[in-house]
Structure formats: C-alpha cells, structure tokens
Amino acid sequence: ATSGDTGSAAEYAMRGKRGVRVFMLSPEGKMSAFQRAQMYSLQDDNIVNIAVRGMFDDAQDIVKAVSNDAAFKAGYKIGAVNSINWARVAAQIVYYFQGYFLATQSNDEKVAFAVPSGNFGNICAGHIARQMGLPIAQLVLATNENDVLDEFFRTGVYRPRNTAETSITSSPSMDISKASNFERFIFDLVGRDPAVVSDLWAKVDKGEAFDLSATVYWKNLPNFGFISGKSTHIDRINTIRFAQGRYNVMLDTHTADGLKVALENLV
C-alpha cells in the first residue's frame, strides 16, 4: 500500500522481474497527479495497481489483514514492501548514520533530525539509530493537518481518526491517521512489555484511543528525544517561499512541513 511516494519506487524496482507480481493499493483520488502518473502509467504484466475507495489507512488495513493471515500469506508467498516490513525500517537506519557523518566533524557532536511524518516508519528508524548510540539530540516529528502523532507527543493521547476525519491536504503522502510502526516505539516507551502493547493496540483495532499521560510510562518520554509540531497548507506555502527566497531551493510540500517544524525548534 502507498500514500503516493513509495508505490512507484516499489513498482519500478519490481517491474519486469520474473516470479514476482506486485499488487499496489493506493487511495483513489488522494494522490497528486504526478504520483498517479508515475504509478498508473506502468504497463508491465507483473504490476497491478488497485485504487481503493478511501484513504491510505484503508489500503494499509487491507495489507495488514493479509499479512496477519499466516496461512494465506504462506500459501501464496505474499510479502509486504512498505513500511510495515521490518526490512524497510532497518534499511532506513543507515540514512541517519550517513546523515550524521555528513553533518559533523567529530563523534562528540550531536544533531537533530526533522522528519515529515504520516506513518512512523522513517522516524522510527531514527529512534532505533539513537537507541544504537548515534548522538541524536532531538528527533523532530512534523505532521500536516492529520496530526494524530503530534497530538500524542503533546498530550499522551493516541487517537487514530477514521476515513471521514482524515483531511485531504497539499502534502498527500502524509494524509495518514493510523500510523504504522508506532507500536514499535510504544514498545520501547512502555519498557518493552509486549502485554502492554497488545492491550493498547486491542483498543486501536476497535477504533478506540488510548491515553498514557497519567501513566508511569509517560515520564519516560523525554529520554527518547522526541519533539513534535504541526504544519498547515498556509505554513507549507510560506515555508516554500522562504526556502526559495533565502536559499534558492524549491521544496516539495512534505519537506516544507518538516522544515517549518524544524525552524520552530532550533536550539
């Protein structure tokens, strides 16, 4: 499943490969025209694009249901190539180490990474890199109007939205209201207790919220270096204009979300 960006990357990587068929689920009418053209113009026999009536979360729920059916998955040799696959997260850890080496002169320096986030995959890789010992002072999580993750890091309440409550924005790859990989971070936050995570996600699977603000776990949050913020359409426009005027760099809307929140949290 894709919200717009990784779908074409996966399809182009797999096109023409023998013994592999790709079924790519995407939210109908919710991606940019360029993203749709990248994916839907492929005519390879082993690439099948499926437009789902709903948001990205609906497409991702289908993929998760297939992945959770072990017998069906094994029988048809099905694998997932988006961010619910641990291999995807593991590969992204490398970005943070490389970024750190490019930005610093010595191992004594600390850095902050700002990550525009819908799903929690990319910044989860940053969290793991930090846990591995990479000197990351802050992980700056930026959302668009679909601010379920920002709400959690500000309040302790994780409240996934349904399709009707999910906004269609000008940074469409972040139009996600039920973040994958977030349970991987919560696992660390609650002391790596699988029973606690299981209980919390039983609520999520029923469409309910959970609140950690009054628990002992919430006191641990500062130890993980996360801060968060939200960006709106007008913020994106202003940030794109700022970057063009100051640096002569044209940003895409998702990067603009990340830069806007980063600028608010400069240290």
Task: Map each language-model feature to its residues.
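PLP-dependent amino-acid enzyme catalytic core
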Residues: 1-267
